[in-house]
């Protein structure tokens, strides 16, 4: 059996950025021990030296929601400061701390979502319409990043299926496509290819219709009982807990129903590394690291972090495995 080494920070971080960061830390006289810390910890050290002063997001507003027993997990929650401070949102930078540092000025007042394509009722809804129309509930979900780290997060939102039924897709609609806000003035990574990882923006994602209708698929508007902070995808994002995190598109402004399979940003950028389905699967490795285990964020310190086995479909096989019956999960990763 072929043995896979554990991914290093250089594997999951763009190479040029990884070595540039190390050169800067050395120039600041940072010790060799600090250079051996994870990339995100090195970013924290740099932030301490920079003392950057950027707009801070206003505190989240408390939400009213139910707490159905069916959606609780007997697992400890990831600390809130980790959920809101350790993020991938390349529109605001590549480091895990960048979104929290750079997204504070994102304007979400008057936010609207356009819904069109193969639907009976094309329409545009603002975020307040959605909050009034669809009752909210809290769901505690596992979250698994393709970079082999994980969290347990208490999202607040409503089933995507409820919005789909409201829009009344036609029989032609086989997929649901999503698009993030495109606003380079607010999202600096969209105009700076280095800061934004060289991706083509706006960020886009998609699901098969049966995936989108699964009760697990959530449109989240809050976390930890409050409205989403910008770095977590305010004011509305997708949560599909059986899929890797890059499928969970943030700051959605457009939902389109289509007959054709929609493009997906990471699949376009690196199709051999990021598939359309992106189902969590410990038996199908990323080309550069194993997916058999995951680092549990919030456990231990920087040098003593718990790892645990990754579960097929992130532990949600009972709810979603039937969606992929007869599909080769290795080829359709």
UniProtKB/Swiss-Prot annotation:
Mo-molybdopterin binds at residues 87, 90-91, 145, 180, 232, 237, 248-250. Keywords: Metal-binding, Molybdenum, Oxidoreductase, Periplasm, Signal. It is found in: Periplasm. It comes from the Bacteria. One of its GO terms (molecular function) is metal ion binding. Its main location: periplasm. One of its GO terms (cellular component) is periplasmic space. Its EC number is 1.8.5.-. Predicted to be exported by the Tat system. The position of the signal peptide cleavage has not been experimentally proven. Heterodimer of a catalytic subunit (MsrP) and a heme-binding subunit (MsrQ). Part of the MsrPQ system that repairs oxidized periplasmic proteins containing methionine sulfoxide residues (Met-O), using respiratory chain electrons. Thus protects these proteins from oxidative-stress damage caused by reactive species of oxygen and chlorine generated by the host defense mechanisms. MsrPQ is essential for the maintenance of envelope integrity under bleach stress, rescuing a wide series of structurally unrelated periplasmic proteins from methionine oxidation. HAMAP family: MsrP. This is Protein-methionine-sulfoxide reductase catalytic subunit MsrP. It comes from Pectobacterium carotovorum subsp. carotovorum (strain PC1).
């Amino acid at each position: 059996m072929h043995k896979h080494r554990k991914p290093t920070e250089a594997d999951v971080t763009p190479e040029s950025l990884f070595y540039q960061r190390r050169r800067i830390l050395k120039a600041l006289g940072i010790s060799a021990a600090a250079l051996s810390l994870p990339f995100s910890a090195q970013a924290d050290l740099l932030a301490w030296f920079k003392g950057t002063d950027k707009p801070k997001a206003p505190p989240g507003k408390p939400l009213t929601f139910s707490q159905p027993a069916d959606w609780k997990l007997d697992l400890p929650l990831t600390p809130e400061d980790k959920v809101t401070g350790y993020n991938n949102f390349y529109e605001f930078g590549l480091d895990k701390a960048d979104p929290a540092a750079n997204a504070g000025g994102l304007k979400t007042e008057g936010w609207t979502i356009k819904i069109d394509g193969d639907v009976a009722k094309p329409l545009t809804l603002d975020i307040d319409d959605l909050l009034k129309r669809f009752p909210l509930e809290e769901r505690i979900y596992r979250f698994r990043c393709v970079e082999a780290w994980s969290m347990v997060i208490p999202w607040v939102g409503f089933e995507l299926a409820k919005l789909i039924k409201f829009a009344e897709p036609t029989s032609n609609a086989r997929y649901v496509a999503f698009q993030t806000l495109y606003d380079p003035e607010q999202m600096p990574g969209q105009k700076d290819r280095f800061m934004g990882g060289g991706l083509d923006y706006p960020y886009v994602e998609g699901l098969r219709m049966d995936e989108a209708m699964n009760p697990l698929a959530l449109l989240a508007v809050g976390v930890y009982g409050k409205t989403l902070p910008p770095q977590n995808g305010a004011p509305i994002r997708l949560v599909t807990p059986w899929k890797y995190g890059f499928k969970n598109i943030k700051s959605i402004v457009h939902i389109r129903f289509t007959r054709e399979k929609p493009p997906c940003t990471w699949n376009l950028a690196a199709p051999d590394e990021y598939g359309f389905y992106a189902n969590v699967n410990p038996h199908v490795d990323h080309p550069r690291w194993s997916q058999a285990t995951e680092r549990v964020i919030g456990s231990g310190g920087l040098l003593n972090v718990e790892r645990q086995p990754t579960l097929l479909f992130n532990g949600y096989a009972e709810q979603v495995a039937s969606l992929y019956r007869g599909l080769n999960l290795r080829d359709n990763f």
